[in-house]
């Protein structure tokens, strides 16, 4: 297995797909990295030479990925909650942040239903 940005990427897959195993790199960014490194997207990771791997590492290092990206995202969410903007309030309440309706849906974000006891002796 090749190692890029301290992540083991699979050898049996194409380079573009293998790069997506790194948090913060999707398909479009992976193909962009391959173009900058002059590596064919369709070659398998196992077939890459050490020079090509080092070029991929060098190009991928320029992007925010893995721990730095996770930290940045969590700090952004904390900042939203501190300044009490709409998104921060939704995060704090555990409700959907991006405008989805919550009257009938949003069970994943709200958690399981809290049942209310009905009237006795009908």
Swiss-Prot record:
Q: Which GO terms describe its cellular component?
A: cytosol; small ribosomal subunit
Region Disordered: list its residue ranges.
94-122
Q: What GO molecular function terms would the record report?
A: rRNA binding; structural constituent of ribosome; tRNA binding
Q: Which domain of life is it from?
A: Bacteria
Q: Bias category Basic residues: which stretches? A: 106-122
Gene3D superfamilies, sorted: 1.10.8.50, 30s ribosomal protein s13, domain 2 (4.10.910.10)
Q: Which GO terms describe its biological process?
A: translation
Which Pfam families does the record cross-reference, listed alphabetically? Ribosomal_S13
Matches recorded under SUPFAM superfamilies:
S13-like H2TH domain
Keywords, in A-Z order: Ribonucleoprotein, Ribosomal protein, RNA-binding, rRNA-binding, tRNA-binding
* Keyword rRNA-binding among UniProt keywords: yes
* PROSITE patterns to which the protein is assigned, alphabetical: RIBOSOMAL_S13_1, RIBOSOMAL_S13_2
Please give the subunit comment from the record. Answer: Part of the 30S ribosomal subunit. Forms a loose heterodimer with protein S19. Forms two bridges to the 50S subunit in the 70S ribosome.
Instruction: Give the family per the record.
Output: Belongs to the universal ribosomal protein uS13 family.
Q: What does this protein do?
A: Located at the top of the head of the 30S subunit, it contacts several helices of the 16S rRNA. In the 70S ribosome it contacts the 23S rRNA (bridge B1a) and protein L5 of the 50S subunit (bridge B1b), connecting the 2 subunits; these bridges are implicated in subunit movement. Contacts the tRNAs in the A and P-sites.
- Name it: Small ribosomal subunit protein uS13
Instruction: Tell me which species this is from.
Output: Mycoplasmopsis synoviae (strain 53) (Mycoplasma synoviae)
């Amino acid at each position: 297995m090749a190692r890029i940005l301290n992540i083991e990427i699979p050898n049996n897959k194409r380079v573009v797909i293998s790069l997506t195993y790194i948090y913060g790199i999707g398909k479009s960014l992976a193909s962009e990295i391959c173009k900058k490194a002059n590596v064919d997207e369709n070659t398998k990771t196992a077939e890459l030479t050490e020079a090509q791997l080092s070029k991929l590492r060098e190009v991928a290092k320029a992007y925010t990925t893995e721990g730095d990206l996770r930290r940045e995202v969590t700090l952004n969410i904390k900042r939203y909650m501190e300044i009490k903007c709409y998104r921060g309030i939704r995060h704090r309440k555990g409700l959907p942040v991006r405008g989805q309706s919550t009257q009938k849906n949003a069970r994943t974000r709200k958690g399981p239903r809290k049942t209310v006891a009905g009237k006795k002796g009908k």
